[in-house]
Amino acid sequence: MATIGPSGLHPGERASVCPHEGVPRPSGSLELECLQQFKVTRTQLQQIQASLLCSMEQALKGQDSPAPSVRMLPTYVRSTPHGTEQGDFLVLELGATGASLRVLWVTLTGTKECRVEPRSREFVIPQEVILGAGQQLFDFAARCLSEFLDAYPVENQGLKLGFNFSFPCHQTGLDRSTLISWTKGFRCSGVEGQDVVQLLRDAIQRQGTYRIDVVAMVNDTVGTMMGCELGTRPCEVGLIVDTGTNACYMEEARHVAALDEDRGRTCVSIEWGSFYDEDALGPVLTTFDSALDRESLTPGAQRFEKMIGGLYLGELVRLVLVHLTQHGVLFDGCASPALLSQGCILLDHVAEMEDTATGTARVHTILQDLGLSPRASDAELVQYVCVAVCTRAAQLCAAALAAVLSRLQHSREQQTLQVAVATGGRVFERHPRFLRILKETVTLLAPNCDVSFIPSVDGGGRGVAMVTAVAARLAAHRRILEETLAPFQLTLEQMTVVQAQMREAMIRGLQGEASSLRMLPTYVRATPDGSERGDFLALDLGGTNFRVLLVRVAEGSVQIINQVYSIPECRAQGSGQKLFDHIVDCIVDFQKRQGLSGQSLPLGFTFSFPCKQLGLDQGILLNWTKGFNASGCEGQDVVYLLREAIRRRQAVELNVVAIVNDTVGTMMSCGYDDPRCEMGLIVGTGTNACYMEELRNVASVPGDSGLMCINMEWGAFGDDGSLGTLSTRFDTSVDQASINPGKQRFEKMISGMYLGEIVRHILLHLTNLGVLFRGQKTQCLQARDIFKTKFLSEIESDSLALRQVRAILEDLGLTLTSDDALMVLEVCQAVSRRAAQLCGAGVAAVVEKIRENRGLQELTVSVGVDGTLYKLHPHFSKLVSATVRKLAPQCTVTFLQSEDGSGKGAALVTAVACRLTQMAHV
């Protein structure tokens, strides 16, 4: 018997509910009018979908709906299974299968290959218990637990129990849940408004036979989702159609107002059985729905559930049959006493009468058992009624599911949602056609959702055990993560120690004593005061591209014109003479372009290679880096080499005034706009700082008055072992794998070249412990420098949906869950926070030194900053500033981001030098 589903319907068209080929459609006007009520158009389904989605979003926001709505209850289940969960768990299932209670012993092995079937036993709940006092019900449950365990050698071990309680509850924790209202025929007094977990614990204690700890309260819908077999796509929706109906799904926690959280996901139980909207559901309600509702235990409540749930489908069929019989259409108008009795047609009867394999034979048998004498045409019409009622139920269920899928697609901002839906309940088990119609209707209503439906494996048993196991796994993984990241959480005391150590190293370095800080004089003796004027040239050499700049300093403005020139490999690795001749050629070309030929402008040279300065215009190249290896340069004064190249190029006059490193250039660039800027800070690929020191404190330069800019070279701070207590196993791994083990230890804990590597080593460690990526070791994480520091900035800049985290890690070939994404974010935050705090401790040491040098109670000072990590990371600058405020409360520090420190800064160093020279002449 092939069902014609809703595929291909146009707006306003109705889905066919023909039971099977060969069965005549009802021809009488009464039966047609009767069954026409159960037909639903696509437009009506779309209206239900939209209305339910609106109710869901209102409930998530905590807004009251004008009509009875869905509840959207957080279940505090925060993760779906990984497949590695293991252990023994006890499960108590109440309310999932009508008037019965089930106890299970579930063993999870952590592997698909070695699966242990759960042991279970079902207990029938007497009707007087279902309608009696609440304590009586929970005492009955405790007795059933004891009776079940009596059959097994449990001894006196503590047992972990998951409680599957399939009624609307308000959960405030995984093991705290208050019953909102009874459904499914239960009406035990004294339970609504009470914590059912505590009621069960009290009953178990009264029983006193076994030590049982109730650790999780789960409804059958959540258990269905959690009990789903792991497939190729995440199972993040659970759908139950049993005696009642409900759905749950994994929602972004930030959207659940009741949680007040902004990270991760949580499973939300929709409780859609209570959904009702007159505009959406009113047009599809029949007279039979109204009659069923009036006769129910809960008139006016659970209206949506009463159109779908298995507890009601048989009763709807009975009401239709009674109506047709009373009008003489069926059974010659003779209704038996049984047919007139509420509840005589059950879900199983409807399923059997729909079964295509038995034809109408089983219909005859069931009707005869009800005291009826059906003709062949009666059996066919009864079968048609069953199909009409169940088809509508499947279509309404599909409209509700489509609303959930739309919600998921929207909240995840995905063009096409790929998701698995776990299905459970006897309606799915007994009605194969129900699932087919559901699938077809979902495809029609949610065309951009690629959905696979997976039957849940004992959601009430294994699924509830899985919730308990997942909670245990998350708790264990959380402990490991916190232990791993604990060394990165610097205390105020630790930061104060770093500040003091930095201060001590500064003093020793200035006095020429052994120190990890070089404290090199730069021969820059003043910062800009705003009176600088004129045109200056600047050169910027630090890589394969070389810049020549014209910097015009006027009152209140600095204009920059620059030209980029490439340095061919043959020049970078050839003779030094040819390299500097090429540089001069570029300068001459720039002068021609700017109409400066023949002019001798003061020139500042930013030379970003290791140098020892002997004067403002003297710098000895210690060694080439960054792919340069020009011969005859190391150990030579690079300003002299430049001047010699100028001399060789006749008719060119250039006045080389200063050689500058990028840190000093940064300070000077900001100093023009803010005269209080007396410190420069670089936090990029590397890190360094400079500041204006009292000349009397600089042992290597004669003089007792005035200032001197000191290049700290603070990346080497801690090379004497002073940072050993802060160094982690991951820092050690990064250091040992570097090209300079044991060197630049401070830089390796702060700068952009190394933070990504620290994160990579932490991720490897957590993966090896099974905390990340399900413990699956991947080759990509083994590769050095695969995790770029820019990833930290992108990950920590991410929106709350963690899309960037997923994209970055998936591009690296890693398969991750939502939990993995959150943990990677936490790792990045811990590493970058420590880096910023260490940097802040260094800045605090410097500004405190400046304050005490001048004998001030309070100091107001600015710091010029440059570097990609500082500028691009979303939180680094704020963390540095906050740390300085804590460690140097007597200093008011303003951080200024530098603009072109290597160009503008070099020109301003030159401008200040010219100003000082002119003042000296005067």
UniProtKB/Swiss-Prot annotation:
Residues 25-469, 475-911 form the Hexokinase domain. D-glucose 2 binds at residues 608-609, 625-626, 661-662, 687-688, 713, 747. Residues 529-660 are annotated as: Hexokinase small subdomain 2. ATP 1 binds at residues 93-100, 436-437. One of its GO terms (biological process) is glucose 6-phosphate metabolic process. Residues 219-458 are annotated as: Hexokinase large subdomain 1. Its EC number is 2.7.1.1. InterPro entries: ATPase_NBD (IPR043129), Hexokinase (IPR001312), Hexokinase_BS (IPR019807), Hexokinase_C (IPR022673), Hexokinase_N (IPR022672). The keyword Transferase applies. One of its GO terms (molecular function) is ATP binding. Keywords: Allosteric enzyme, ATP-binding, Glycolysis, Kinase, Nucleotide-binding, Repeat, Transferase. GO terms for cellular component: mitochondrion. Residues 82-218 are annotated as: Hexokinase small subdomain 1. D-glucose 6-phosphate 2 binds at residues 540-544, 662, 685, 866-868, 902. Pathway: Carbohydrate metabolism; hexose metabolism; Carbohydrate degradation; glycolysis; D-glyceraldehyde 3-phosphate and glycerone phosphate from D-glucose: step 1/4. It catalyses: a D-hexose + ATP = a D-hexose 6-phosphate + ADP + H(+); D-fructose + ATP = D-fructose 6-phosphate + ADP + H(+); D-glucose + ATP = D-glucose 6-phosphate + ADP + H(+). Residues 1-23 are annotated as: Disordered. The N- and C-terminal halves of this hexokinase contain a hexokinase domain. The catalytic activity is associated with the C-terminus while regulatory function is associated with the N-terminus. Belongs to the hexokinase family. Catalyzes the phosphorylation of hexose, such as D-glucose and D-fructose, to hexose 6-phosphate (D-glucose 6-phosphate and D-fructose 6-phosphate, respectively). Mediates the initial step of glycolysis by catalyzing phosphorylation of D-glucose to D-glucose 6-phosphate. This is Hexokinase-3.
